[in-house]
Structures are given as structure tokens and as C-alpha cells.
């Protein structure tokens, strides 16, 4: 069985490879601006900014663009003022959605969000309606081809403070508390692993979807991720691996 994690990995790779790379840059720049505004322009003391810089570099964003975005966040350069907003929603099949947006116009974003949700069989929920389903966690991803000895990686991650390791898929997924995220990542990198790290919202319970509901939820997630104002979408669906692959293949035709 697979769920949101597998879909997110596929989506991440696709955005980094295809014509949507410019949209990926737009989202990364917004994250850099807000991270610098909230915690200052020094990545050594601002872990959110450090993570944003790493993601921008992984996407091959030019250094000049990264530096300009940080300066816009700290106020050294003029720029658009972005606001971080969390939206909660329901998707087809009763799937819970936790949506993080960075916007310069919250009325526009809410209107566009309602339109996208309605078009794909979803709806906005009241604040708190689905938020309780998700836990804020640190997530570290290590490509499977880097892991010669899974047991060694597991022990190293646990000793460094990891809470859980899922080694069934690619990449290997390591869960930490938000506070331990960077220290675990740094320990892995010190031992030769190339790891991606970030904050995620992990569901405490999941909903199984099949058939038309499965098609609708993947189409909805795709449409939400395509919104410029939406940074991240978290959900709690589970789906058969083969069914997900078939639906995604059909969507990409």
C-alpha cells in the first residue's frame, strides 16, 4: 500500500525535471523570503532558512536568486509581502487535506482554493476540523542506492535521535521530532549519506481510497500543487500501489 508519501516523491521528481521547474523556483523563492523574514538572514541560526537554501540548491537555483530572495525577506531589498496561511479541507472519499500557502493576497488564494476543491469533489473545512489528524514532524529522505547496509543506517539514525525509519520504499524515510531534524541530518551527512530534510505534517490515521475516489484525489492533489500560492499539501489517503501507478500514468498521457 502507498499513500501521500509516494505521490509526493513522484511529484517532486517531476517538478524538478519538466517545464514546471519555473513554478518550483517561484515556490522556493517565496519560502526563502518568508524564512528570512521570520528568523533572520543567517542560515546558521535559522534552521528553516537553512532547509530552504538546501532545497533551492538541490533544484539548481542560481546563487544570485537565492541571495536576492533572502535580502527581500530581511528587508535589505524591496519585495512583495507574503503571508503564511494554513487551510484545512476535505477531499473525495473523506480524505483530510492540510494545505500550507504563502500568499500576497489571501482573498484571491481562498477564492482559487475553493474553486479547485469544488471542481475536484472537495471542500474547505472549518479551522481545526482536520488539523488534529496531522502531527508536525521532521522528515529526512535518503536515496535507496546510497544505503549499502540498511541496519547500519537505522542504528545510526536512532542513535542520533530519529523516532522512526521506513526502509520499504525509495527513498528511505526517517522521521524525527522537529527539534532533532537538523542534528540527525548532519550526523548522516557526516557519515557520507546525502539526505534531504524538511518539516512535514504526518497523519495519525489514514483513509483507504479506490476506484473513482482514487482518481479524484490524485487529480485534486495535482491541481492544488499547481497553484502558485500553495507551498505544500498534506493528506491522509492510502491507495494500492498498482492502482496509483496506473492512475498517474493515465494522468501524464
Swiss-Prot record:
- What molecular function does GO assign, one term? DNA binding
Top-rank lineage group of the source organism? Bacteria
Instruction: Please list the disulfide bridges.
Output: none
Per UniProt, subcellular location reads as: Cytoplasm
State whether keyword DNA-binding applies: yes
Instruction: Give an example GO cellular component term for this record.
Output: cytosol
Is Ribosomal protein there in the keyword field? no
Instruction: Supply the alphabetized keyword list.
Output: Cytoplasm, DNA-binding, Transcription, Transcription regulation
Q: Which SUPFAM superfamilies match?
A: YebC-like
Q: Enumerate the Gene Ontology biological process terms.
A: regulation of DNA-templated transcription
Say which family it is in.
Belongs to the TACO1 family.
Q: Which HAMAP family match?
A: Transcrip_reg_TACO1 (MF_00693)
NCBIfam families reported in the protein's UniProt record: PRK00110.1, PRK12378.1, YebC/PmpR family DNA-binding transcriptional regulator
Per its record, how is this protein called by name?
Probable transcriptional regulatory protein Tlet_1011
Q: Which organism is it from?
A: Pseudothermotoga lettingae (strain ATCC BAA-301 / DSM 14385 / NBRC 107922 / TMO) (Thermotoga lettingae)
